[in-house]
Amino acid sequence: TETMEKEFFRDFEKLYSRVFVVYDRPKDQEHPERNMTSRIMRRYYKNDMDLEERKLQLTLYPEGGNLVAGVENCVAFEAVWNDGEWLEGYLHFGGDSVPAVHRGRGVFTVTPEKGMEREVLFRTRDGQDISASLPKAEEGVALQVRRTEDAWRIRIQTSGPLSPDSLLLTVMREGVLKEYKRIDSTYQEFTLAEDTLEAGVHQATVFDTQGRVYADRLFFVRKKEVETASLQVEGVREEYAPYERMELSVSGQKSSTPISVSIRDGYMHETLYDNASIMAEMLLSSEIHGFVPDPGWYFEEDDENRRQGLDLLMMTQGWRRFKWRDMAVKGEWELTETAEKAQV
């Protein structure tokens, strides 16, 4: 509901669990306050000390991580209140207007000159303005990832004295290498057939032989066979009398497998923003930074709006699991704890 949207919105500065949400950061890490709420019983409100004047925030996210001089860059943006509620409106830059298409997010293109410093303006539907400065454009590597009809196109452009033949591109999923390409020109495109990739978050990274990362981008691959429910239940009515016998028809795959069944009163069901299915939780929510509100929305349909919203989510909340230099260069890291010899 709209009321819950304002009271229980995600905040990147808070801590989250898959089981329940921790709304206020504990003061003491060793003995955290038990300042939690059973949401069925009552609402939760922030501590008075956390209340502050609402302010508009505009954040810019250059695709790949950096704004690169002399080449075309895509920049995602997110316009929200400081408590996380998103805004509707348009971003204005260089005479162009770009709408916020999903949860205050959108994307625009720019070809900056080296050292260029400019501001962009976001105007809300009710006429409020908020501005933000573009990062200073430097020489480096611009990375763009786009989905075509049945493949993913990765475009790499270098700017400045970088030697292209020292750069490499990897595509990984859950830490497993899926593609490995050597970059041998200042402008290069690679096409990855979608049927060679698995469902879930993939990480495209451009780095050199020393392990220095120049660009990094997350993108999400959808698979209909994964998203389609393997079981269908028929025969559920809107209402039942107390202790009334129920007969349901379950159909699905022919393979024999154990199935768990859970029955609850739909009247007591509370609509939450954390409405992810097991698939959405494993493939999406657990793979990116921060709480993802209403993750089930991205998988309700396979249309352009949801694909665009999913890609904007990757460009704004996407993050790297580890530092590539630490993992790639010998001597950059050492074990601080011995390996466990049994289950924890």
Residue ranges with predicted function:
Residues E2-D11, T124-S131, V176, V206-D216, ...:
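Short acidic/polar inter-strand loop motif in beta-rich domains
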Residues Y45-G70, A132-R147, L162-P164, M315-K341:
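Edge strands and adjacent loops of beta-rich recognition modules
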Residues D11-F12, V19-E53, L58-L60, V68, ...:
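Low-complexity, Pro/Ser/Thr- and charge-rich linker/hinge segments at domain boundaries
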Residues T196, V201-Q203, D208, V213, ...:
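Short, small/polar-rich motifs associated with maturation and membrane association
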Residues S97-G104, Y180-T186:
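Short beta-strand segments within Ig-like beta-sandwich modules, predominantly Fibronectin type-III
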Residues E2-D50, S133, L218, K254-L335:
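Acidic glycine/proline-rich low-complexity segments
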Residues T1, E72-D96, E117-T124, A151-K181, ...:
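Beta-strand-rich binding/interaction modules
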Residues R105-E113, R153-R155, Q188-D195, D216, ...:
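Exposed aromatic-hydrophobic patches
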